Amino acid sequence: MKKALIIGTRSSPLALWQAEFIKAELSKHYPSLDISLRHIKTTGDKILDAPLAKIGDKGLFTREIEHVMLRNEIDLAVHSLKDLPTETPEGLVITAITEREDNRDVLISKGKYTLKTLPQGAIVATSSLRRRSQLLHLRPDLEVIDMRGNLNTRFKRFEEGDAEAMLLAFAGVHRLEFSEHIAEIISFDDILPAVGQGALGIETRIDDEETRELLKVLNHAETELCTKCERSLLRTLEGGCQIPIGAHARIENGTFHFATYVGSIDGKRAIKKSLSRENVTTVEEAEQIGIEVADAARAAGANEILCEIRTDNA
């Protein structure tokens, strides 16, 4: 067995929390293993003065880490699964997907407002086109502004700025202990999360069989099924992280449920599709559901919406 592992990670507080969490989980199973972290800056970390959709589509928070791994300088990388493009670079593989945290979005608001009680014309901050689209679909009267940066930075800017509220992922808010600021945990009926939201994806070299074997203990089978369904939809629609697509797969009482949202950035056009199926037990079956729902969304006009957005962001 390997005596040491080097984990590659971004250096934001949330990324470090996630890497330390994986380090601790591995240490429980392999107490003699020497595990260290290597901090790596990504494009998304370096360019902070532009909306994410304007600086690129795929791999903004992963590409540099993957390059370091391909040079054999780290053994594995811990990513927010929602940041991982659906096409993995040649030579790399997602070896484990951890059990998913609550993957709903949350509303942080200065007056403890909810989505429905926010004052007309209130300013809401988010860095996500997906959240912007779904929020404006629900509340076209609101003004949505872009806010980037790590969670600590966003909370500071929010407190000092004009926004009445901001939208974030529950998982990050909870992991960094900002939960007391949550005004509302948003229902899936109102806003669907990003593909893979709430789960961690652990990436390795495909030929590093020893590391891949060590990581098997961290894979959560149900989360793997659900997130691979979501990622299959995203791959079929040829969407990236900065496209307004929401998706949520879950297994309830033995039934696999999947829903998606594709919308224009202003929320005026929205396509919602869902599918439920019994006895989904393999990754292939889950991925097929993603393809079928993507095809249904395409038939309803999703391609036209996404092509317009890609053209605008080019």
From Swiss-Prot:
PROSITE patterns reported for this sequence: PORPHOBILINOGEN_DEAM
Enzyme Commission code(s) on record: 2.5.1.61
Catalytic reaction annotation: 4 porphobilinogen + H2O = hydroxymethylbilane + 4 NH4(+)
GO molecular function, a single term: hydroxymethylbilane synthase activity
Cofactor, free-text remark: Binds 1 dipyrromethane group covalently.
Single GO BP term: chlorophyll biosynthetic process
Cofactors named for this entry: dipyrromethane
Pathway assignment: Porphyrin-containing compound metabolism; protoporphyrin-IX biosynthesis; coproporphyrinogen-III from 5-aminolevulinate: step 2/4; Porphyrin-containing compound metabolism; chlorophyll biosynthesis
Xref: NCBIfam families: hemC
Comment field (misc): The porphobilinogen subunits are added to the dipyrromethane group.
Name under which the protein is recorded: Porphobilinogen deaminase
The organism of origin for this protein: Chloroherpeton thalassium (strain ATCC 35110 / GB-78)
